[in-house]
């Protein structure tokens, strides 16, 4: 019968198994090594006996046991050869080709609990009430300093309290109106509008700083933030930023114009200056000639200045004419913080 051929890996495993079996079975001392059985010697072939005083011949030491660690290291070294080698495994993986298509989806889970539409509507109403309350609190904070006592606007019931008596259609309408408003404009932190309390006399060839203002209690007037000194007429910037400033003066001539042509240098200058230094700092200025002016006229100036925190601005009137002037009460001065 033809002998079967074992692969190299099988022979390696058999050798390691033999070594492991030898670990538990020690070779007895009386046993002779394999292949050392005495064979019959032919006549005359006996070796001569050694002399009596000669040293004894060295004997071959017999192995009584196998070290387990050496056997395991041999097994590990031999396990990477043959069919278990890394190169052969890598070549086998490359021959597998592309993976197949994904399998079918698993079974669908059980359906969740049934929630009635009434419960969903109540939860939606609660969410809508919370959103409306949050919006009202923000609007109240934004408009707390905007209204004046003279506005006399009647108090209304908050919309969040009105939701309790509204039907679902009204709730949806309120939600749509809230979303249609879009993003709100940023809050203005500093602004004012004041008027001159009484008439102010300005002598000829004089530069006069206006003061003695008051806050009008009319619809549309506003005052928000600190910094306005009504007595001195100076507005101190609470924070550094860009400020839009405006001033409008109603001016009356107190003296009758002299006979003859008016001199070209008879003019008025209206200025808004920083720290009362109109020549050194940036300022807003308007120049008006008096050649064709009437006895009562209006002069205005407006623009944007950057103010540092703690710096003040005020209104100046430069009367570069040959007659005195009167700034009428009701002339106004205003400012608003545009941004930082």
Swiss-Prot record:
Impact upon substituting residue 142 to A: Enhances secretion and favors trimer formation
Keywords: Disulfide bond, Glycoprotein, Hormone, Hydroxylation, Secreted, Signal
Gene3D superfamilies in alphabetical order: 2.60.120.40
Disruption phenotype: Mice are viable and fertile without any abnormal phenotypic features in normal conditions. Following hemorrhage mice show decreased hemoglobin and exhibit a delay in recovery from blood loss, rapid suppression of Hamp/hepcidin is also compromised. Loss of Epo-induced enhancement of erythropoiesis and reduction in Epo-mediated suppression of Hamp and Bmp-target gene transcription, however there is no change in baseline HAMP expression. Significantly reduced whole body, femur and tibia bone mass density (BMD) at 6 weeks and 5 months of age.
Outcome when changing residue 292 to Q: No effect on secretion
Keyword Repressor attached: no
PTM entry text: N-glycosylated; required for secretion of the mature protein.
Positions with biased composition (Pro residues): 40-58, 99-112
Modified-residue entries (Hydroxyproline), positions: 99, 101-102, 104-105, 107
GO molecular function terms noted in the UniProt entry: hormone activity; identical protein binding; molecular sequestering activity
Domain of life: Eukaryota
Resulting phenotype, residue 319 to Q: Abolishes secretion as a result of protein misfolding, protein is retained in the endoplasmic reticulum
Residues carrying sugar: 229, 281, 292, 319
Record region (Disordered): 30-63, 79-112, 141-161
Segment forming the signal sequence: 1-24
Effect of residue 229 to Q: Abolishes glycosylation. Abolishes secretion
Annotated site location: Required for correct protein folding in the endoplasmic reticulum: 319
Mutagenesis or variant effect for residue 273 to A: Abolishes secretion
Coiled-coil parts of chain: none
One GO BP annotation of this record: negative regulation of osteoblast differentiation
Classification via PANTHER family: ADIPOLIN, ERYTHROFERRONE
Known role: Iron-regulatory hormone that acts as an erythroid regulator after hemorrhage: produced by erythroblasts following blood loss and mediates suppression of hepcidin (HAMP) expression in the liver, thereby promoting increased iron absorption and mobilization from stores. Promotes lipid uptake into adipocytes and hepatocytes via transcriptional up-regulation of genes involved in fatty acid uptake. Inhibits apoptosis and inflammatory response in cardiomyocytes via promotion of sphingosine-1-phosphate (S1P) and cAMP-dependent activation of AKT signaling.
Protein name, as recorded: Erythroferrone
UniProt organism field: Mus musculus
Higher taxonomy: Eukaryota, Metazoa, Chordata, Craniata, Vertebrata
């Amino acid at each position: 019968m033809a002998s079967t051929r074992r692969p190299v890996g099988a022979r390696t495993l058999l050798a390691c198994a033999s070594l492991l079996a030898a670990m538990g079975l020690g070779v007895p001392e009386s046993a002779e090594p394999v292949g050392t059985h005495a064979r019959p010697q032919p006549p005359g072939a006996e070796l001569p006996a050694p002399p009596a005083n000669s040293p004894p011949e060295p004997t071959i030491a017999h192995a009584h046991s196998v070290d387990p660690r050496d056997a395991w290291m041999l097994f590990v070294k031999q396990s990477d050869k043959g069919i278990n080698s890394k190169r052969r495994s890598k070549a086998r993986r490359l021959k597998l080709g592309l993976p197949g298509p994904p399998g079918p989806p698993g079974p669908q889970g059980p359906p969740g609990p049934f929630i009635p539409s009434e419960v969903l509507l109540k939860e939606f109403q609660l969410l809508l009430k919370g959103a409306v309350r949050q919006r009202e609190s923000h609007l109240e904070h934004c408009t707390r300093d905007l209204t004046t006592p003279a506005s006399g606007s009647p108090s209304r019931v908050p919309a969040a309290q009105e939701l309790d008596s509204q039907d679902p259609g009204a709730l949806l309408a309120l939600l749509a109106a809230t979303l249609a408003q879009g993003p709100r404009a940023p809050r203005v932190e500093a602004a004012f509008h004041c008027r001159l309390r009484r008439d102010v006399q300005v002598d000829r060839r004089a530069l006069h700083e206006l003061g003695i203002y008051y806050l009008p209690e009319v619809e549309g007037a506003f005052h928000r933030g600190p910094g306005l000194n009504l007595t001195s007429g100076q507005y101190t910037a609470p924070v550094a930023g860009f400020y839009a400033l405006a001033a409008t003066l109603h001016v009356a001539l107190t003296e009758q114009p002299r006979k003859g042509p008016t001199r070209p240098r008879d003019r008025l200058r209206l200025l808004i200056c920083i720290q009362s230094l109109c020549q050194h700092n940036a300022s807003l200025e308007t120049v008006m000639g008096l050649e064709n002016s009437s006895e009562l006229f209006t002069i205005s100036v407006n623009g944007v200045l950057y103010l540092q925190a703690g710096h003040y601005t005020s209104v100046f009137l430069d009367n570069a004419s040959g007659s005195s002037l009167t700034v009428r009460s009701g002339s106004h001065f205003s400012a608003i913080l545009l941004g930082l």
